[in-house]
Amino acid sequence: MGFVDANTISKMSRLRCGVPDHFSLNKSHELHLHIPTFSSHYTFYPGHPKWPRTKRRLTYSFQPGTRTDVINPILHATQMWASVSHFTFTQARSHNRANIKISFQFGDHGDGFPFDGPGGTLAHAFPPSDGRLHFDGDETWVDGVLPGAIDMQTVGLHELGHILGLGHSPDYNSIMSPFFGSGQRKFLGQDDIDGIRALYQS
């Protein structure tokens, strides 16, 4: 029989990504799980979906009417992923033709993963090559660190990892950890870099 300890309750009450945590472990993780110092924690979606070799130049777009102050944080997030991979990201003029479609949604918005209002689930994204990235429009989004608010760049960086094919990492220092704190900014960690390079063998 399982039990809920203080640590579990703390995690359950944290802000988090809405993507489920059931991912397949990478081979390196399976081989080195017994050696924590050298283990990797990155995971992939079942079947390891990824963008085809012909799609290394990805376009992204915001749903028309999206507030302009979220554009730069997402730009910076794409630049971070580009700096450690073979991907490039360009903002598209047409939302419908973009590889990555970014939007703010509220409550039940028709994709099977309803948002829950302020707190709780912050955002979710779909694996390659779906390209949908949804932020919960009920959250307080900012560019930077502000108590009680959510950093758009941090969550965008995480969700773009899902868009590229990475799952959640149990390493809280990884950008792919499913948990976030308000008033917090995170960056790519070595585990994230190792994961994207392993998935695309670069």
Q: How should each PLM-predicted stretch be described?
A:
Residues 1-202:
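Zinc-dependent metalloendopeptidases
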